[in-house]
Amino acid sequence: MSGGRAGEIRVCVVGDELVAGVGDRRGLGWVGRVVARTPQDEQPLAVFPLGIPGETTAGLVDRWRQETNRRFDDVAGASRLVLGLGRGDVLAGVSLARSRLNLANILDEAHARRLPTFVVGPPPTLTPAVNDGLRQLSAAFGDVCHRRGVPFVDSYRPLETHDDWLTDLSAGDGTHPGQAGYGLIAWLVLHGGWHAWLGLER
């Protein structure tokens, strides 16, 4: 495809509804906040948040190629993939082994396509049973990424007992954060290797 600005990096952020900022009255979500704090004077970005409510890793396996193929130019180094992993696998009862395999398959294919990938793990909810699964899932996702040298932002452990996160969830539906919660995720991403992954100076 064409039509972009000269020298821009195109970033597809594929995941669940959190990548689209559901629950944020400002409509920025964590993706918009990260982009707003990313220097673009010398390296412009075109960022495409592509969220589906309750998305699972199986859904991502089926979807990510189609989403990226329609938005990326076939120019080496000009495209990036971000995976925003959510609670979908836990709610759908997907086994930990299958979740690991699904993520591994995406990362391996992206690597074969020379497509740099950045992974953001699932944040906690207010439901203890769901959090039990998310705690294990986040650790598993982190391990899969670590084995492949892919940057992984753990959103679960830093927020599990974070007062501002829990207060923000409590003010909403208990699952989707508001402005404060998305700001916390954005902070974790920005301090989790984001600039280095894009090749930008902080």
Predicted segments — roles?
Residues 70-78, 113-114, 196-198:
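Glycine-rich phosphate-binding loop signature in dinucleotide/nucleotide-binding domains
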Residues 124-202:
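Catalytic His-Asp segment of secreted/periplasmic serine-dependent ester chemistry enzymes
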Residues 50-55, 83-90:
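Cell-envelope and extracellular/periplasmic
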Residues 22-27, 93-97, 128-133:
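Short, solvent-exposed loop/turn segments at secondary-structure boundaries
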